[in-house]
Amino acid sequence: MGILKLIRETSARHQHDDALARAGLNAKGWHILFQAMIEAESSYNPTAVSPKGAYGLGQLMPQTARSLGVDPRDVAQNLDGAARYLLAQLSTFQNIDLALAAYNAGPHRVVEYSGVPPFAETRDYIARIHRIRNRLTGQPVSQPSVHLANRRPERPPVHIDLN
């Protein structure tokens, strides 16, 4: 079975998830977003491995795959895990850019920065997915603007007792 067909089948299984409406996505928008994310993550390579150890089409980290109960080396399970993880981020953040940032940098980073973390990798990742979405829908491909968090994370002061 072809990769694009598996992506379509996976997105179709999840097209009625409540998270989509909360993030302003319909079934078609969800399919395009999911396919664009998979393209950005792995260029449709089911055996892609990142320098950090993420694996497969959805570039699932080993711990994320375990928490989702999927085998990242199984193409269908990897896609299902990626879909469920992205849907969890959409449900939590109710915003496409924040959900993509959470998928890329981790949800704790989005919470820590109260927005898209100011990391070049995350900014470029979100912009790339928007460009792919535009291409897949026949929209003009332009450089989308990604709104980064405008503040540093709040951290309690560190007290060091030298005595």
What label would you give each PLM region?
Residues M1, A21-G24, T47-P51, T64-V75, ...:
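Second-shell loop/turn segments in exported
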Residues M1-S43:
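Export/targeting segments at the very N-terminus of extracytoplasmic proteins
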Residues K5-A12, I32-Q35, D80-L87, D97, ...:
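Solvent-exposed, polar/charged alpha-helical surfaces in well-ordered, non-transmembrane soluble domains
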Residues Q15-G29, T47-V49, Q94-A102, P140-Q143:
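Surface-exposed patches in mature extracellular/periplasmic domains of secreted proteins
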Residues L33, V49-V70, N78-L86, P107-H108, ...:
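Substrate-binding/active-site groove segments that recognize
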Residues I38-E41, Q63, Y103:
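Active-site-proximal beta-strand/loop segments in catalytic clefts of secreted hydrolases
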Residues A101-H147:
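Catalytic and substrate-binding regions of cell-wall glycan-acting enzymes that process beta-1,4-linked
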Residues P144-N163:
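Low-complexity, Gly/Ser/Thr/Pro-rich intrinsically disordered linker/tail segments
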